[in-house]
């Protein structure tokens, strides 16, 4: 029997952001709908490896391969995908485009934030590593395989040695959690990164005039992003009282798949 490809999703509640994961069931079910006809499996992490005070939910994605190995789950390739994404049912099989490499999608959102994050982490932890914003990927969609297990072991060792600095940077500067360090660490450890098309991680959609907000948007109230990609990442959305992340994830899921219990 051939090894299966796996979709790995972190779904952890956080005391610092209560209710953040409430709409994640829409993401998880969309991925199950996409994966099951292909014979792929979806694994959802709901138990912490470390307490929140030591490691937040974002960093737990780096344990995907370790957890699969420790539980004797064989696999071919693994997509580590954020739980604030929804996949279109007609999405092509991106695993076939990986060439066996570490794959991600270039971050295509707020360049000021990316530049600031690169600078802060560079100054504090990665002085000798050069990272440009046009090389910078979003960590919400990453394809890996067994040969990347050693890389993630190095990531964990680096976190164990520098976790206090990571946590203080996030607390003081608000420049992200795992994403910028992972970009730097792929450079530091010479990981061959292949950038896939942004259709597989359509990010910060409100900046692209793809989300309609009443009394603000000039364009029609439709799901315009459905024509702009295959995987919709609901990040960087303003906390609108009526059209927050949960609203957009629920609306998108029901449009594509119907109610959750269907």
Predicted regions and their residues:
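Residues that flank catalytic or metal-binding motifs in active/ligand-binding sites
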Residues: 3, 61, 81, 137-138, ...
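Short, flexible, basic/aromatic active-site loop/helix in glycosyltransferases
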Residues: 119-133, 150
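GT-A fold catalytic core of metal-dependent nucleotide-sugar glycosyltransferases
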Residues: 57-118, 143-144, 148
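N-terminal anchoring/stem segment of glycosyltransferases
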Residues: 1-76, 257-262
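Extracellular/periplasmic catalytic domains that process cell-envelope and extracellular macromolecules
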Residues: 1, 97-98, 134-136, 218, ...
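A recurrent flexible, glycine/aromatic-enriched loop bordering the glycosyltransferase active site
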Residues: 129-144
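Short, solvent-exposed loop/turn segments at secondary-structure junctions
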Residues: 12-15, 49-51, 85-86, 109-111, ...
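A glycosyltransferase accessory/donor-loop signature
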Residues: 150-262
